[in-house]
Structure formats: structure tokens, C-alpha cells
Amino acid sequence: MKVWMAILISILCWQSSVWAVCPAWSPARAQEEISRLQQQIKQWDDDYWKEGKSEVEDGVYDQLSARLTQWQRCFGSEPRDVMMPPLNGAVMHPVAHTGVRKMVDKNALSLWMRERSDLWVQPKVDGVAVTLVYRDGKLNKAISRGNGLKGEDWTQKVSLISAVPQTVSGPLANSTLQGEIFLQREGHIQQQMGGINARAKVAGLMMRQDDSDTLNSLGVFVWAWPDGPQLMTDRLKELATAGFTLTQRYTRAVKNADEVARVRNEWWKAKLPFVTDGVVVRGAKEPESRHWLPGQAEWLVAWKYQPVAQVAEVKAIQFAVGKSGKISVVASLAPVMLDDKKVQRVNIGSVRRWQEWDIAPGDQILVSLAGQGIPRIDDVVWRGAERTKPTPPENRFNSLTCYFASDVCQEQFISRLVWLGSKQVLGLDGIGEAGWRALHQTHRFEHIFSWLLLTPEQLQNTPGIAKSKSAQLWHQFNLARKQPFTRWVMAMGIPLTRAALNASDERSWSQLLFSTEQFWQQLPGTGSGRARQVIEWKENAQIKKLGSWLAAQQITGFEP
């Protein structure tokens, strides 16, 4: 009893953290938003169950269904029944499908496993559930899961699936099996390939009116043999002998949550013959089948994988000005987890790209991780009923603006500071965007090199800069004075690559100022257009003023 209370508390704590984030909507707005999403999900359900097609990815459907339930709980509506199929022409299951309760995390699974023994882990194969009924050694009936008590008669369809044994013998001759009809895959790696909408594809094949040869692309994974042999090893052996070989191959004994986690991670990265969305842990000891009821299984639980892509709510649209003056758009998100990374922001790109995406606060977007773990937008999966998009700033900035601070230059000025402090430029360790903002807000820099004048006392008394860090920062600023001339020129934003700048052999400011367009044009990777940009840059009044200031500070290469 204590274990169940602990699991319940764990689940409630997790749920409360999700449900607590309720939209700040009026009752009328809430009713409209809930009604619109409810109608859309109902349409998807009708397409799925009546026509066997899906206009939405399985993962997106699941997450938007969960979002709808969250909204309904937030505003006191009755949560919808999830994915309840129509019961036209339904057939009673000899043994009810119980479904499986989902564990929130490894800790919840560990609590569930603590007082249980003889436990086994299987992949949670992603397809559609089915009952197989054998009588006198022959396949007598195949029934879709339906609502767990009744389902559709799939006997004709299943009889055409070559992977399903049509005859069996021994203990299986008069048996009822439960399993998953799945899309057969060759070397499917879940981590890399995701769900590929497998559930909807299988449903589509099973719903088609024609008995297509494509049914042979389906397989079956038996995960339950109600009233079968008591020992799991005996069950697996008999199933394998009958032709259900995958069950024995992918069922492993486990003693604790750590072992489950290892197997789960292994299958997440391994080449498998089917799509999966997690693992199921089940006890070998099961009640008699007459006691099985939908939603009442206490002997098995699931631990699903985190989706490769997550549906996230857009909380705000923000505009950033980079060091070159380009305006980029960033979406601020309600936090989601991707792998082990908490994602709260995603870069949309240019203003034009944002307008093409048509993203507004309140929309639901699908986010995944691209190379090097960078969040990206895959799709806009739901747009809110009321959409207000902010106005982007005027495009008044360019590569030669905001070397000196002003109110309108705030964002580009900070971007320039972040750039010059980066490893590839002046290498100022220990300070990023937040640190630069704190310094500028307190000391009101005149230009991008004003930080060279800060004293240890000023750094120590800067809000947002830890006193223990201020001495290290002052040391970094002093070390920067000894950086090579080319590094300082890069910090000033010269429109050249480092390779081209090094090849120029320019080692002083005066020498650089007298270099001609023809000189720059002969450098590697520098054409006529780039050479003209360099000339425009070095003749800019702000650049000349910065060069004179650095000379007064006796920075290497700038001295008269």
C-alpha cells in the first residue's frame, strides 16, 4: 500500500507541475480554444477509425490530445475520451484488453517494481492492438482492440498477413493471444528515425477495403497469453515454436529499474524490426483472464520514450539584432524536454522566415533538436483562435552601425560585445550576454571597448557580477590588451575571414588604413565585393574613432 501511495504522489506531483501552467484566458476564450481543438481531434479520430488515414503524426496527435485534456482540467471541462473508436459491427473480446498505465519516470518505475518479482521487459511496439483466437489449432477470429471489450472483426485481414500463423498446436491450439500488429521494418533505429507515423499506417492498411498484398508488410508481436503457462519461459518457448518468434527474442528478465533503463536505452539505439515508443514491464504472474478489465491491469506498466519532437506553446515572439545588424526572430516557449535538454527558446530566423511560418504567441509548434543539440522548428501544429503578432523593429541597422552605445542601438551593441568576447576573437573567458548587459547597464559604456577602463572596484560593485568573479574578469580584460593586432581588428568587425586577415600580413593600424582595394582583392577568398566592403569599413567615422581610442590605450598595432 505504501508503494502505491508513493507512486500516486509521484504522479500527482508531476501532473500538478503540468496542470499548474494554465493559460490566462477568459471563460469565453477558453471555451472557444477548447472547442476548436476538440473538433479537430474528433476529425482526426473519424479519419483514423473510419477511413484508416491520418493527417497528423502520431506523436503530434498524442501531445495535442494531452494538451486538450490539460486545458479541460484548467477550466473545469470534462476531459474527452481518448481515441474511442466507433463500435459499428463490434465483436466481443474473449478476454478484455486492459491497456497499460504509463510510468512518469525511472523513480516511479522503481517504486512499482520494489515489491514485485519475476518481472520481464518487452519493447512497447508501436502499431495497433489485436486479439488472436485459436480454436482446434486454427485461427478462428481476429479482433481489433476497439474499446477493450469490443472491437472490429479483422479475421479476413489478419488471415492474409503471412507473419501470423494460421495454424498452431499443443497448448496454443485453443488459446487467446493479445498482441500488436506492426509495420515490419529492417533495421529501424528509434533514436534516429522516430515513429514514422507507424500506428496510423498500420491502421490505414487494416481499414482498406481491398485485400492488398501490402498486408504482407505487417507483422505481429504477441505480448500476452491470458491463462497461458505459469512460467514466462514456457510461454516464450511455446510461442516461438508456433511461429511467434519475436516475443521470445525481445522479452528479457529484469530485477530493478536500472536493468530496465539499460535495456530501454539499448533498444532506443538498436536496429529493430519494428517501431517502438518505449518499453513495457510485466509480471509473469497474472490474474485469471475473467478478471481482466480495461484500465485495471496492476501487473504491467509502460515507460515510454521521450518524443524525438515535442509540441511546445509559444509564449512570446522576440526580436534580436546581431552584430552585423541583421534582425532575427526568436520564439520564447513554455519549457519542454528534448533528450536531456530543457528547451525554452528556438530561433525562427529572419523576419521574412517568421512571416512565412506565421507564428504568434499561443500557437503550438513542433520542436526537435538539430545537429549539435540546437533546437529547431519542424512545424506549426496548432494556431490559437486569437492571434496577435508583434511588430518587428525597423530595419535601420547594418554592419557599420552601433559601435557606439545609444538607446536605439541597445541590441546590436550587446551583440558586438558578445562577439568580441568570444573565444575566436579576444577570448574573454567567464562573460557572456548576461554579464555584458550587467556591465553596460551599470557603467553605461560609450563604445564597444569602454570595458578596458573598468577598475577592479567598479567590477566588484557591479550588480549581477559575483564578487568572486570580478577579479578574474579584470584579469581577463587586462590580458586582452596583449592579444595580437589581428584579433583587435576582428573585434572591430572587419569584413574578412581570419584566414584572409592573417594572409594580409597587416600588423599595424596605419598600414591597414593605407591599403588599397586592389590589395584586399588579392587575398584568399576575397573578391571585389568583399574588398569594397573593407574599404567602406576602414573609412567609416566610427571605426576611425575606435582606432584612435585604441591607440591612446597603447593597444598593440594601434600605436602611432
UniProtKB/Swiss-Prot annotation:
SMART domains: LIGANc
GO MF annotations in UniProt: DNA ligase (NAD+) activity
Record's keyword terms, sorted: DNA damage, DNA repair, DNA replication, Ligase, NAD
Pfam families in the cross-refs: DNA_ligase_aden, DNA_ligase_OB
Coiled coil: none
Listed EC numbers: 6.5.1.2
PROSITE patterns according to UniProt: DNA_LIGASE_N1, DNA_LIGASE_N2
The organism's place on the tree of life at top rank: Bacteria
GO BP annotation list: DNA repair; DNA replication
Active site: K124
Reaction equations catalysed: NAD(+) + (deoxyribonucleotide)n-3'-hydroxyl + 5'-phospho-(deoxyribonucleotide)m = (deoxyribonucleotide)n+m + AMP + beta-nicotinamide D-nucleotide
Function: Catalyzes the formation of phosphodiester linkages between 5'-phosphoryl and 3'-hydroxyl groups in double-stranded DNA using NAD as a coenzyme and as the energy source for the reaction.
Family statement: Belongs to the NAD-dependent DNA ligase family. LigB subfamily.
UniProt protein name: DNA ligase B
Native source organism of the sequence: Escherichia coli (strain 55989 / EAEC)
